[in-house]
C-alpha cells in the first residue's frame, strides 16, 4: 500500500520509543511504527517478506505495505545510528543531503517526531542493561534481569547516547526541519497528553482517556 503521508519517530535507544510507537500503532489510524530499519530487524524482515538482500528500494516498498494503516498513514521509528548508516550508503546528487534524500525516498510527505530523554545517565544504564540481558522490553509480570554493573560500559553508552542525540539535533538544524519534540520524561508520566500532542501535530484525531491503549511493556523501575 502506497502511503499518502508519513511520519518518523527520530530517536536514540532507551528513550521510550516503543511506548510511543505502540500507543500510536494501537490507535489503528496512525500507521504502524516499528524499528524497520534496525540492522538486525531489516535482515529478518527482508527474509520474512521475500525481499532481495541489499535492495533498499524494494525493502522500503515492503515497509510501506506493513507500516501503513488503511487511511494511508505510514509510521516508522528510526534510531540515529541506523539513520547514519543508511545515509552513508546513499550517493545522492552533489549538494543534496544524503539523509534528506533517504527520508524523501522512504517516507512520502514526511513529518518528524523527535523523541529524546533528558536523564542521560538513566538512559545509559537502561541501554547497558537491555544489551546485557537481552530484555529490551518487560511484559507485565516479567522480572527484570539484574546483572552486576559495569560502570565503564555504562559511561560509554551515556556518551554515545549524547552523540546520537547531537546527531539528530545537528541534522534538523542543517535541513531546516522543525520536528515535534517529545521528552521521555513527559511521555512516561502523562502519556495521553503527549500522544495527543503528537496526533495533533500529525493532523490526526485525538484520543479520549477511555480510548488510550494499554501499555504493552512496563517501565524498568530504576532506569
Predicted features along the sequence, with ranges:
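The conserved 3'-phosphoadenosine-5'-phosphosulfate
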Residues: 36-44, 142-146, 152-154, 172-223
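Surface-exposed, flexible loop/turn segments at secondary-structure boundaries
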Residues: 17, 38, 81, 120-121, ...
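PAPS-dependent sulfotransferase catalytic domain
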Residues: 79-170, 192-207
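Aromatic-acidic/polar surface patches that form glycan- and anion
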Residues: 2, 12-13, 68, 157-161, ...
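PAPS-dependent sulfotransferase catalytic core
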Residues: 1-72, 217-219
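Short glycine-/polar-rich loops that comprise or flank the Walker A/P-loop
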Residues: 72, 107-111, 177-178
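Short, well-ordered beta-to-alpha junction loops that form the rim of enzyme active sites
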Residues: 12, 78-79, 115-117, 183-185
Amino acid at each position: 500500500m502506497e502511503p499518502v503521508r508519513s511520519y518518523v519517530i527520530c530517536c536514540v535507544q532507551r528513550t521510550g520509543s516503543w511506548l510511543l510507537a505502540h500507543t500510536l500503532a494501537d490507535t489503528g489510524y496512525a500507521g504502524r511504527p516499528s524499528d524497520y530499519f534496525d540492522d538486525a530487524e531489516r535482515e529478518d524482515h527482508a527474509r520474512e517478506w521475500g525481499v532481495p538482500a541489499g535492495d533498499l528500494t524494494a525493502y522500503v516498498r515492503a515497509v510501506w505495505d506493513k507500516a501503513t494503516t488503511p487511511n494511508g498513514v505510514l509510521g516508522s521509528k528510526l534510531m540515529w545510528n541506523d539513520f547514519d548508516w543508511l545515509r552513508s550508503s546513499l550517493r545522492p546528487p552533489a549538494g543534496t543531503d544524503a539523509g534528506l534524500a533517504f527520508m524523501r525516498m522512504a517516507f512520502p510527505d514526511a513529518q518528524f517526531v523527535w523523541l529524546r530523554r533528558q536523564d542521560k545517565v538513566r538512559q545509559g544504564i537502561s541501554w547497558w542493561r537491555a544489551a546485557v540481558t537481552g530484555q529490551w522490553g518487560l511484559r507485565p509480570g516479567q522480572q527484570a534481569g539484574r546483572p552486576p554493573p559495569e560502570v565503564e560500559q555504562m559511561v560509554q553508552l551515556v556518551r554515545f547516547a549524547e552523540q546520537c542525540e547531537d546527531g539528530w539535533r545537528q541534522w534538523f538544524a542543517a535541513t531546516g526541519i522543525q520536528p515535534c519534540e517529545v521528552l521521555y520524561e513527559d511521555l512516561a508520566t502523562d502519556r495521553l497528553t503527549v500522544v495527543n500532542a503528537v496526533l495533533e501535530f500529525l493532523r490526526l484525531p485525538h484520543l479520549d482517556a477511555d480510548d488510550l491503549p494499554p501499555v504493552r511493556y512496563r517501565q524498568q523501575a530504576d532506569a
